[in-house]
Structures are given as structure tokens and as C-alpha cells.
From Swiss-Prot:
Cofactor note: Binds 1 Mg(2+) ion per subunit.
Sites bearing Phosphoserine, chain numbering: 101
The protein, known as: Probable phosphoglucosamine mutase
Protein function: Catalyzes the conversion of glucosamine-6-phosphate to glucosamine-1-phosphate.
Disulfide bonds: none
Keywords, in A-Z order: Isomerase, Magnesium, Metal-binding, Phosphoprotein
């Protein structure tokens, strides 16, 4: 019996348009989703980012859903969090976001959402894959075909609701530069900040799926213009999004890109209680949360894992160092726009972003990768799980939920995990001192090189 091909990765289905992401696949995924949620009279929300292939994929998926008896609610071009929120508020049975997030313009993808605004879990994705593989669809009669509705006006409600939820003081305006990457947040993110009373300067805020202003990945290599502009205009903060605006990265008032882990920690401290992050996040989060009586739970890499843990453990906040943050008091969908508003609120409340970041201790880190054929990864990781801890004598805690993460008595740590997309084993480590980090790095590399 043939194994069912894997379509979903860590964040939906993703690939190059007309290669991995074909119109035939989009049609079949829509039909499979319709079958999964019950078909006739069910409602599905669809949104898309600015990519040039988005509209035609939207058309095909809408047709597949209607062909299966579902009604389709079209948002048009919107950030991913609008899809999650609309699915929740419109009491739809599912949501679809057509996006490849931070990937280049020739890519696109499909991400699915539950009725509560939570991304599809792995077991749900496996079911969709099985239905697609077996072509197990229910096509309805001519008089049972679903209808299509335009709900693009919902965007205004979303903006009003995130502004209200953010806690921003409109009587204390700050100068904010926002770089939208010509992505799905190009209108909504600046508009939300303006409605919140901020003085807004925009960069790359013209929707364009070829991403002419900068690459959609919000990292230091792509944010030079934002950093220069913040400093030149004496702005209070700069905000940057990826292609679908489910992420947010900040630049401080001096034009320096914020350390991702520290930025996550600043926001987590605002909520307190139980916060959730991934295995690759810095120990600075744990240390700062301990100081205020909170605690940190860790999950495998991927926002859906963070969301599941928040739900299960009544978390107050969650996120990944990449800038993907979840605000459970609003919606379980990662939301870069609300994240940006709330960072502005912390500056109003606590002062300059640079000072907030400087108050969190720096720890030296390394991020490396060791070449390992995909066929060897399972064997290598089983040896890591069984033997790696024996290389150290000051182990405090071991996590094996996504690779192997070893924490040491001084709060240093090392994570070894296989890349999900490339032929590498990744080493991430953080040391309380440079000397300890150097020792961890040497031991980790020697161990891996001996078993690969």
C-alpha cells in the first residue's frame, strides 16, 4: 500500500506556483476541506495576500467549495489574522488563507483555520491529505451548489477591534514608521495605527505581489531602509511585517533592530502568568518571567503548537522569536498588526524601547547547521536522544518534544534538531558566559560529526 504524500509543512501547504502549488491541488484541497467539515450549507472564509497567483487560486478554491455545497465568504486581499478573526466572528466552519508568508513572490501556499480561529492541527492536516490522495469528495447536484458572498467590509471591524483591544492611549501619540513589505498589511497596519492616534510614516505600503521594495522576510538584511528612516525622522519606533502580516519585528528609536527574543520577552512580561514559546527561544524569557512570578511552557517549532499549548494550559500569551505572536484574549491566530499596536503601547507605558531591551540581559548565542542527508536524520536523532546528555555533567533539564534541548544548571542550553526542509541538523545554543558557550559548541559539533 502506497503511503499518502505529505502536503502540509510547519505552516500549511507551501511551494512554487505551478510546481508544488498547482490549480489542480488547490481545487482538490478545497473539495477535501468541504468533505471534512460536512459539505452542504457549511460556510468557509477565504482571504489572500498580495501575490499575483493569489486571485486565481482563490477562484479555484471557491469553485471547489461551492461545487461541494459550501457557501464562500470572500475577504479579498487581507492579512492572515483577518482570516482567523473573520472565521471566528462570522461563525464560519473553516477559513482558508492563500499565502506563502515570507517566501519569495513565485511561491504561494494554503493555510487552513478552524471555526475558533485556530490553525489546523497535524491530525486534521493528515485527514485532508488522505481525502486529497484518495480523491474522496462529495460533489453536489446543480440545485445544491453553494453561494459566494463578499465580506471585504469586515476589514473595518477588524481594525476597530484590534485598536480597542490594544490598550493604546490615543491622547499620547508616538511617531511610528511601519514597513509593510508591499504585502497584505499595506493598508490595514498603517490604518490601525492612525485610528489609534499615532503619527504614521509608511514604507512599502503599496500592495504588490512582486515585493519590489524589499524581500518579505522581516530580518536585518531586508530592513535597512526602515532602520535608517526611524533614525533620520527621530521616530519612536519602527515596525515591520512579512508578506501576510502575521509577524511583527520592531526597530528601536535609535534605528537598531530589536533582538527577537528580547522583544518577545518584553511583550510576555506585560501579560504575566503562563506564556508559551518554542524550544528554540532564549532562556532570557524564562529568567524574566520567573522574576514576576510567571512561568514558561515550550512547544515544538510552529505557531500551531504554541496555540494548542495556550488553549490547553490557559496561557496568557504565546509566540516564537521569529515575531509570530498569539494574543488569546483576542483570537488564536498569529497577529502582526495587534502585536505592533501592543509594542507601541509598551513604549507609551514603559518608555523608550531601547531601554526596555537593554534591561534584559544579553547571552551569547550560536546558530549552526551540520550537513546530514535526509535519509540519515532519523537514525542520527535517535542517537542524539539516547547519548547526547552523557557528554555533559551539569544537566538540569532535557526536552525531547522537537529535537533534543538540554538546559544546564547556569541556565545555558543547547538544542539539536533536524531541519524540516533542508539536509541539515541544526545546533542552537545559548551560554551564560562565552566560555561555557564555546564548550557547548565544541562538544556538540564533535558529537554530531562522530555519528553522522
Amino acid at each position: 500500500m502506497k503511503s499518502i504524500p505529505k502536503l502540509f509543512g510547519t505552516s500549511g501547504i507551501r511551494g512554487k506556483y505551478q510546481e508544488e502549488i498547482t490549480l489542480e491541488l488547490a481545487l482538490d484541497v478545497a473539495r477535501a476541506l468541504a468533505k471534512y467539515i460536512g459539505g452542504k450549507n457549511k460556510k468557509v472564509v477565504i482571504g489572500r495576500d498580495t501575490r499575483t497567483s493569489g486571485k486565481i487560486i482563490e477562484n479555484v478554491m471557491s469553485a471547489g467549495l461551492q461545487q461541494s455545497g459550501c457557501d464562500v465568504l470572500l475577504l479579498g486581499m487581507v492579512p492572515t489574522p483577518v482570516v482567523g478573526y473573520a472565521t471566528l466572528k462570522k461563525e464560519a466552519d473553516a477559513g482558508i488563507m492563500i499565502t506563502a508568508s515570507h517566501n519569495p513572490s513565485q511561491y504561494n501556499g494554503i493555510k487552513l483555520w478552524n471555526s475558533d480561529g485556530l490553525a489546523y492541527k497535524q491530525d486534521q492536516e493528515r485527514t485532508i491529505e488522505k481525502l486529497v490522495y484518495e480523491k474522496d469528495f462529495n460533489i453536489v447536484k446543480w440545485n445544491e451548489i453553494g453561494k459566494e458572498y463578499d465580506i471585504s467590509s469586515f476589514k473595518d471591524k477588524y481594525i476597530d477591534d484590534i485598536v480597542a483591544k490594544s490598550g493604546i492611549n490615543p491622547l499620547k501619540p508616538l511617531k511610528v514608521v511601519v514597513d509593510c513589505a508591499c504585502g497584505a498589511g499595506s493598508y490595514l497596519s498603517p490604518e490601525a495605527l492612525r485610528r489609534a492616534g499615532m503619527n504614521v510614516i509608511t514604507l512599502n505600503a503599496q500592495p504588490d505581489g512582486s515585493f519590489p521594495g524589499r524581500r518579505p522576510e522581516p530580518n536585518e538584511a531586508n530592513l535597512g531602509e526602515l532602520m535608517k528612516t526611524v533614525k533620520a525622522l527621530n521616530a519612536d519606533v519602527g515596525l515591520a511585517h512579512d508578506g501576510d502580516a502575521d509577524r511583527m519585528i520592531a526597530v528601536d528609536e535609535n534605528g537598531n533592530l530589536s533582538d527577537f527574543d528580547k522583544l518577545l520577552t518584553i511583550m510576555a512580561k506585560e501579560f504575566g502568568g503562563t506564556v508559551v514559546t518554542t524550544v528554540d527561544a532564549s532562556a532570557c524569557l524564562d529568567i524574566q518571567m520567573q522574576k514576576i512570578g510567571g512561568n514558561v511552557l515550550r512547544t515544538p517549532v510552529g505557531d500551531v503548537h504554541v496555540a494548542e499549548s495556550i488553549n490547553k494550559n490557559k496561557g496568557t500569551f504565546g509566540g516564537e522569536p521569529s515575531g509570530t505572536w498569539l494574543h488569546p484574549d483576542f483570537c488564536m491566530c498569529p497577529d502582526g498588526l495587534l502585536s505592533g499596536l501592543r509594542i507601541v503601547r509598551t513604549i507609551q507605558k514603559n518608555g523608550k524601547l531601547s531601554k526596555q531591551l537593554d534591561a534584559i540581559e544579553n547571552y551569547p548565542t550560536i546558530r549552526q547547521k551540520v550537513t546530514c542527508e535526509n535519509s540519515k536524520k532519523k537514525t542520527v536523532m535517535s542517537i542524539v536522544e539516547e547519548k547526547f546528555e552523557e557528554e555533559f555533567d551539569d544537566v538540569k533539564e532535557i526536552l525531547t518534544i522537537d529535537g533534543v534541548r538540554i538546559s544546564f544548571e547556569d541556565d545555558s542550553w543547547v538544542l539539536i534538531r533536524p531541519s524540516g526542509t533542508e539536509p541539515y541538523i541544526r545546533i542552537t545554543a545559548e551560554g551564560k558566559t562565552q566560555e561555557h558557550l564555546n564548550s557547548i559548541e565544541k562538544i556538540s559539533n564533535e558529537f554530531l560529526n562522530n555519528i553522522i
